[in-house]
Amino acid sequence: MAIRVLTTRGELPGSGLRRLAGAAGLVSWHGTGRPAPEDLAALAPGSTAVLALGNDPVDAALLDAAGPSLRVVALASMGFDNVDRAAAAERGVVVTHTPGVLAETTADLTFALILAARRRLGAAAASLARGDWGLFRMDDYLGLDVHGATLGLVGYGQIGRAVARRAQGFGMRVLHHDPYAAETDALSTPVDLETLLAEADIVSLHVPLTAETRHLVSHRELAAMKPTATLVSTSRGGVVDEEALLTAIRAGTLHSAGLDVFEREPMGAELSPLAAEPYVVTLPHIGSATERTRAAMVDLAVDNILDVLRDRPARTPLPGTASAYERPVSGSRS
């Protein structure tokens, strides 16, 4: 049987697609923006594998459109909320993602957002671009210090720990809350979420988007934070209730925010109201966006596909889906 791989983008960084093309026939979506589920489903029949970006929809309809030949869905992302994991498990389809390779790069961007939000860099740069710098004033664009501040990390996996390491250079006190983190280290002190929210000057979110974490930060959590605090998120947009955050920012009950992710992505011309707030720094989901890291993500996704198609265990299966890798991948699904 011919090996056919559907990629949700026709062009990806690095040489991963060229490697994949040497082992399989490729069919790709070449539109603009985010592909609609029906666009991908139309290309899916007969696919052996799907290589998808982190916010491209991989639903039951796509899996069914691919048919019984489908063995693996490989995400070129760490997040996996775009995949119907239950549907994949029911159909015996392996699902993989790309943890590890993007942790340090995303931690860099997290710290960039911390600095930009606390020091009001976005508003200051916009003022300069408008030609407003006509007079030096001691009270222009006063921000808040990062050095010596208390940093609270919600989620203490690879990215959270990488952020904690960077915080040491700023002399920060670091707290973290993660009920699933078994390991402890000298970088951070584990606390409950209530303590973290009450004591942190900066709260940074590093959790996947699941039913449990959707709107993890909403009105109650924002009210528990200091009015001088900053909220930063490089995880997934749905973890933060954007309406609640906008209310807190406009009311002045929260100092600032730095966001790389949003509930609706991509936005196009219809921006989130948060993008216009002078105390909010917004970016278009670029946490892993360096040449080397994005290429490494594609390479790992391709490696996962090739491993499964060669009847080997995938390198980075999704958490909680190990049983999918124990089944023989040759033959069709029942």
Where is each model-derived feature located?
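Short, conserved active-site loop motifs that form the nucleotide-linked donor/cofactor pocket
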Residues: 24, 93, 188, 279-281
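Rossmann-like dinucleotide-binding domain for NAD(H)/NADP(H)
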Residues: 95, 228-334
